[in-house]
Amino acid sequence: DNIGVFDRSAPLPTGGHLEQADGTAWMALFSQNMLELAVELAAHDPTYEHMVFKFVEHFYYIAAAMNRPGQDGMWDEEDGFYYDLLQLPDGSATRLKVRSMVGLLPLCATTVIEKWQRQRVPRAMAHLAERMRRMPELWKTMHPTGPGHFGVADRGLMALVNPERLRRILTKMLDENEFF
């Protein structure tokens, strides 16, 4: 999948490397899908519970990388959109500010967590709560989850994008003058 505006698999003439917003979002979604499988396995065999921890951790690390604040993050606070990030050899970074599907794909990394799924892995849920307590800065940038944030039928939402960012991205996505 090479949906960028140039061939992202070729070496960069400037050196450095490209941090891809779409590829990173796909990996977050992959972690969510694997988490769902791990919950199913752990419900029948507790030896798989460590896999639940593993994929929760993977999702959090990916979310932290995508939502890193400042000039070296994929999220552009001023534009309200995700962009690929060019990391140059001198340590500086530049966002490639092209509105494309690249910036919309973080919306796909969203998983509904049912109450019964949480009940199947209580130790994993306790681990999640502890991780949330230790990473408060992350919860400002992704969708809040956990007690006090459950929705209809006590469902939770695990998403890269928090509600404010979701509204900002949708404003761009639904503006017929933004995407041609």
Task: Name the predicted role of every residue range.
Residues 1-180:
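Acidic, mature catalytic/reactive cores of soluble proteins
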